[in-house]
Structures are given as C-alpha cells and as structure tokens.
Amino acid sequence: MLGLIKKKANTLLGIDISSTSVKLLELSRSGGRYKVEAYAVEPLPPNAVVEKNIVELEGVGQALSRVLVKAKTNLKSAVVAVAGSAVITKTIEMEAGLSEDELENQLKIEADQYIPYPLEEVAIDFEVQGLSARNPERVDVLLAACRKENVEVREAALALAGLTAKVVDVEAYALERSYALLSSQLGADTDQLTVAVVDIGATMTTLSVLHNGRTIYTREQLFGGRQLTEEIQRRYGLSVEEAGLAKKQGGLPDDYDSEVLRPFKDAVVQQVSRSLQFFFAAGQFNDVDYIVLAGGTASIQDLDRLIQQKIGTPTLVANPFADMALNGKVNAGALASDAPALMIACGLALRSFD
C-alpha cells in the first residue's frame, strides 16, 4: 500500500496528529484476529496544529511524549499521515513488466509534468494498481506526491518524542484500511457498497465516499465540534478546557439540550446533507447505501439517529474495534467512546501487517 516513505519494520504505532489532539494506537494480530494492545489520546495546545499543518513543533512533540506514557507502550516505530489535501495523486499508464526500480526511474523522468512543484521539494511514491482496462500491455500506476516539508515536520515532531516515522501515509488511504473493518457493522462486505464516511473533527468535516472499498470522492469543509465547544463557553462562561469536559461528561444547565446541543446537531445534519448534494451533483451517483459517522463529534448521543431520520439513509457510528480482542490494560468503555475518532489511527496501525 502507498506510503510516501517506507522502511521495513515490525509492529508500528499508528499516530494521528489532528488539530486538537494526538491519538496513538498499537495493534497485534493472532490467527487472523486483531487485538488492541494499547491506545491513548492526548490534547494538543491551542493552535499547535492549524488546518492539518503543524505550527508549534515543540508543543506537538511534548504531546507525543505524554501520549506514549499514557499508552504504556515501549514501541518506538510509528506511522503518521499527511492530509489528503496536501497530496497530489494521479493515475498514469505505464509499460507492463517493469521492475519496481525501472518504474521508479521512469516516474522520476515523467513526474514533473504531473506535479506543480520543483521535484527536489517533493516526496514521491507510487503503487501499481493492476493491468490497464484500456490496454492489457500497460499497467495503471497510482502516483502520489507531497511537499517534503509536510513529511519532514511530522518526522521532526515524532523525533522529539524519541519516535521514528517508518511510514508516512495519506489520511484517505488510512481511512480505507479501517473502513474495511466495518463489514460486521454494515452487515455486508464493504467491497460491495457505496458508503459516505463523514469525519467530523474539531474544525474540519471531511466527506469521503467509498465505492467498492476505494475512495471516489472527498470534500473538506470548515465545520466541526469546536463550534459546539465555543457556544458552551459563550453561553455558560466556561474556559475552553471546562467546556470541552462538560461537552463529554455532562453537568451543564437544563437548557443545554434545547438551546445549544439541538441547534448544533441540526447544523451537523445540514452539513452532511449539503456535502452529499455536492457529491450527487458531481455525477454518477444519486444515493449511498450508508452514512458512517467518524471523528470526535460522531459520538454525540443520537446524532446518527437524527441524520438517518432527516436524510433517510441508514446511518451508524464507526467502530473499527467491534470484532477485536483487547489487552487487559485497555479501558473498553473509553475505547468504545473514542472509537469513531480513531479511524485514521487504526488505519495507520494496520500498516504493521502489510
């Protein structure tokens, strides 16, 4: 599978650096069944990461050090991801039968016609997808390119915590990997469905439509759980930390549900509906089989039910760990609550088994 940097390693920590937290996941596999060995989530300082870009390297490095302690893991090799919006991908046809080295050399010659940056500033990777449908003597090759600074800043943040980035992946591919674990939730093989995965983070909502297990459409929108946190702060005079805790643990005044939470849920429904309309307008589909909610905001009580009721499409909250065993040190309740926010970390941790 595609990764902008690959170095051979055994078990790898999946580390997702989002705008508000770092999430760590360690998986093992025995007899075809996965097991969660360790996981932890650690908040980031405000504005340490802005719109998927690491701004405060030191702050992110310190959060990574804390998340390692919290997870009680001894592993030092990790997989991180760059955002899909930072990556240029292009499927190109190439001669069949070339070795990996020959493909790589050929791509270096041809890459500048596909990439709008000087090649010395770019990390490039590729994956052979299979024989071309148009010409059986050629193969389809997926080319991925990303500015080196996006890769290097993630490597540097990990290094501050004593970690080595063995693979730098792409968030969209990590999502595809963890999505494949949702078959039992969806009641069907994920390869047979068209599913809208809506990842509602703190500041960004990403719609990824997967058809037969592959991402066919992505759209990012500036909208997320931070809007709810800010409204709690404003209305009840709380700090960011207090508002974030109250949002998760409750204890807010009686009017919270009707005056704050319900309008926010309605706004989420509107965002999901609008994103789907953009997807349908783009062409070949006018329906999806399921809506799957991911990200920290997905676990708001009954949000899935409200979306299903308003949009009319079966909706569920992602839990990639539903069929996994758990190490005794892993808190099952906390993991279930955090599961929808761990889709990318899970997809990254699965790189251990490539």
Swiss-Prot record:
Q: Which domain of life is it from?
A: Bacteria
Q: Which GO terms describe its cellular component?
A: cytoplasm; type IV pilus
Keyword list (alphabetical) reads: ATP-binding, Cytoplasm, Magnesium, Metal-binding, Nucleotide-binding
**Residue sites binding ATP per the record:** 18-23, 202-203, 247, 296
Which stretch is the leader sequence? Answer: none
Q: Where in the cell is it found?
A: Cytoplasm
Cite the GO molecular-function annotations of the record: ATP binding; metal ion binding
The UniProt entry lists the main location of this chain as cytoplasm
* Consequence of gene loss (knockout): Deletion mutants lack surface pili.
InterPro entries listed in its UniProt record: ATPase_NBD (IPR043129), FtsA/MreB (IPR050696), PilM (IPR005883), SHS2_FtsA (IPR003494)
Query: What biological-process terms (Gene Ontology) are attached?
Result: cell division; type IV pilus assembly; type IV pilus-dependent motility
Coiled-coil spans in chain? none
Binding sites annotated in the UniProt record for Mg(2+): 112, 115
Matching entries from SUPFAM superfamilies are given as: Actin-like ATPase domain (SSF53067)
Q: What does this protein do?
A: Inner membrane component of the type IV (T4S) secretion system that plays a role in surface and host cell adhesion, colonization, biofilm maturation, virulence, and twitching, a form of surface-associated motility. PilN/PilO heterodimers form the foundation of the inner-membrane PilM/PilN/PilO/PilP complex which plays an essential role in the assembly of a functional T4 pilus. In turn, associates with PilN and facilitates PilM functionally relevant structural changes that differentially impacts PilM binding to PilB, PilT, and PilC.
Subunit structure comment from the entry: Interacts with PilN; this interaction modulates PilM ATP binding site. Interacts with PilP. Interacts with PilO. Interacts with PilB, PilC and PilT.
Q: What is this protein called?
A: Type IV pilus inner membrane component PilM
Encoded by which gene? pilM
